Amino acid sequence: MTDKEQVVIYTDGACKGNPGRGGWGALLLYKGAERELWGGEPDTTNNRMELMAAIQALAALKRSCPIRLVTDSEYVMRGITEWLPNWKKRGWKTASKQPVKNADLWQALDEQVARHQVEWQWVRGHTGDPGNERADQLANRGVAELPR
């Protein structure tokens, strides 16, 4: 499938302190059009912001569609492609019977993914990928715009 036929989404999270003030950002591209999304939370973690970026980007789409979602988060990538099916089978417990961290957001992401046909792609962060760099800027904007 070409990028002209699917929505391409770049997501990123940022945190000043972990936990600390955090932001998430997403860049959505479709047929030459762009949409930027960002937000933040005063007390959060980087992993939660990475998840929020993906959740908010997918939730922003009004109807089911094919998507290529690009993330630099190994946590999100491995969680959605490797760990999630087993967490669900175990009632949101890890292999060591511990509650899954950020289960609320993993469940929200799972709900959003079910609405679409998502192809996941991992990229190394901060290596000059234009979409990833834009998502990073948006995530940092999410932090910067939090009230002090």
Curated annotation (Swiss-Prot):
- List GO terms (cellular component aspect): cytoplasm
Q: Per UniProt, where does Mg(2+) 1 bind?
A: 12, 50, 72
Catalytic activity, EC: 3.1.26.4
User: A single Gene Ontology molecular function, please?
Assistant: nucleic acid binding
Residue ranges annotated as coiled coil are none
Q: Where is this region: Disordered?
A: 125-148
Q: Which PANTHER family match?
A: RIBONUCLEASE H1
A Pfam family this chain is assigned to: RNase_H
Q: Which InterPro entries match?
A: RNase_H, RNaseH-like_sf, RNaseH_domain, RNaseH_sf, RNaseHI
Query: What name appears for this protein in its UniProt entry?
Result: Ribonuclease H
Sorted alphabetically, the keyword list is: Cytoplasm, Endonuclease, Hydrolase, Magnesium, Metal-binding, Nuclease
Q: Which one GO biological process term can you cite for this protein? A: DNA replication, removal of RNA primer
Tell whether Cytoplasm is among the UniProt keywords: yes
Explain how, and how many, cofactor molecules are bound. Answer: Binds 1 Mg(2+) ion per subunit. May bind a second metal ion at a regulatory site, or after substrate binding.
Organism, as annotated: Pseudomonas paraeruginosa (strain DSM 24068 / PA7) (Pseudomonas aeruginosa (strain PA7))
Q: Where does Mg(2+) 2 bind?
A: 12, 136
The family note in this entry says: Belongs to the RNase H family.
Question: What NCBIfam families does the annotation carry?
Answer: PRK00203.1
Q: How does it assemble?
A: Monomer.
Required cofactor(s): Mg(2+)
The protein's location, in the record's own words, is:
Cytoplasm
Where does the RNase H type-1 domain lie?
3-144
